[in-house]
C-alpha cells in the first residue's frame, strides 16, 4: 500500500477523541515548547521585516510630512497610491508569496521540534531550518499557492465556507512536516480528509486555544503574545498524533 493510502485508512479508522483530554495535553506540551514557540515568532518577524519596511516606510514618510504642515491632507496619500506602478504591485505580491513560503517552512520546522520535545528528544535552533533545502521550497511554494487559492474561493463563496476550510487548511503544514515525501495533491487530500473527520473537535480547539493565547498574551502586557501565540498549533498537533501518528516511535535510550 502507498503511504497516502495508509494515512487515509488511519483517518477513516480514527477513534473518537476527547476535547478536554486534547486541551489539557496541549497545555502540558506547551510547557515544554514555549521557548521554541517564542523563537518561531521572532524568526517570523525578522523574515517579514523587509516587507513591512517596503510597504510602510513610504506611508510613514507621508504622515511625517503632514505633521509638519499641521493639518491633514489626503492628497499625498492619493498621489502615492495613484503613482504605484504595476511593477511595484507585482513586486509586493511576489514578496508576500516568497516570505510566506519561508514562514511556512519555519512553521514546518517548529512542528518537528514539537514532536521531538513531546518525545523528550534534544532539539536545537537549527531544527527550525530543517526544510530550508531547495528540493523542499518548490513543494512548499505549491502548497502556499494551494492554500491561498482555496482560501480565496472560500471567501468568494460569501465567506461562510472559510470557516469550514479553516480546519483542513490548518493541517496542511503539519502533514507536510511529517510527510514531506508526499505530493502536493496528496498532502492537500490528507489535510481535508483529516479536517473533515475531526472538524468540530479541531474547530473548537483552534478557537479556544486562539482566544486563550490572545487573552494570556494581553494580560502579560501584550509582549506575552510572542510567547503564547504558538499555543494554537498544539491541539492540531495532538489530533494528528492520535489519528495518524508517526512512522518512528520515541527512540529507546541505550546506556553503555
What is the meaning of each model-derived region?
Residues 57-62, 159-162, 206-210, 222-226:
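Juxtamembrane/interface motifs at transmembrane-helix termini
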Residues 2-10, 85-119, 151-186, 217-248:
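Selective recognition of hydrophobic, aromatic-rich stretches within alpha-helical transmembrane segments
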Residues 246-256:
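Short, charged juxtamembrane terminal tails flanking transmembrane helices
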Residues 75-80, 90-94, 136-139, 152-156, ...:
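Short acidic/polar alpha-helix capping motifs at helix-coil junctions
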Residues 56-65, 119-125, 129-134, 233-240:
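Repeat-unit-sized solenoid/scaffold elements
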Residues 2-4, 10-119:
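Short, small/hydrophobic-residue-rich motifs at membrane-helix boundaries and re-entrant hairpins
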Amino acid at each position: 500500500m502507498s503511504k497516502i493510502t495508509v494515512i487515509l485508512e488511519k483517518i477513516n479508522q480514527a477513534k473518537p477523541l476527547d476535547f478536554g483530554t486534547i486541551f489539557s495535553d496541549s497545555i502540558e506540551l506547551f510547557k515544554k515548547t514555549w521557548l521554541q514557540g517564542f523563537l518561531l515568532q521572532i524568526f517570523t518577524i525578522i523574515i517579514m521585516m523587509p516587507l513591512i519596511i517596503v510597504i510602510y516606510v513610504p506611508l510613514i514618510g507621508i504622515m511625517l510630512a503632514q505633521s509638519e504642515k499641521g493639518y491633514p491632507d489626503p492628497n499625498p496619500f492619493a498621489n502615492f497610491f495613484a503613482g504605484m506602478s504595476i511593477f511595484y504591485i507585482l513586486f509586493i505580491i511576489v514578496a508576500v508569496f516568497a516570505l510566506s513560503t519561508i514562514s511556512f517552512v519555519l512553521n514546518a520546522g517548529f512542528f518537528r521540534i514539537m514532536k521531538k520535545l513531546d518525545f523528550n528528544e534534544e532539539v536545537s535552533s537549527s531544527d527550525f531550518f530543517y526544510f530550508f533545502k531547495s528540493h523542499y521550497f518548490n513543494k512548499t511554494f505549491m502548497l502556499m499557492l494551494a492554500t491561498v487559492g482555496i482560501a480565496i474561493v472560500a471567501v468568494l463563496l460569501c465567506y461562510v465556507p472559510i470557516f469550514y476550510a479553516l480546519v483542513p487548511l490548518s493541517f496542511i503544514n503539519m502533514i507536510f512536516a511529517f510527510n514531506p515525501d508526499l505530493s502536493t495533491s496528496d498532502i492537500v487530500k490528507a489535510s481535508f480528509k483529516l479536517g473533515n473527520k475531526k472538524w468540530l473537535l479541531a474547530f473548537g480547539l483552534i478557537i479556544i486555544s486562539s482566544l486563550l493565547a490572545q487573552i494570556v498574551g494581553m494580560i502579560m502586557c501584550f509582549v506575552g503574545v510572542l510567547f503564547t501565540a504558538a499555543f494554537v498549533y498544539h491541539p492540531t498537533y495532538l489530533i494528528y498524533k492520535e489519528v495518524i501518528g508517526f512512522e518512528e516511535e520515541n527512540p529507546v535510550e541505550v546506556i553503555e
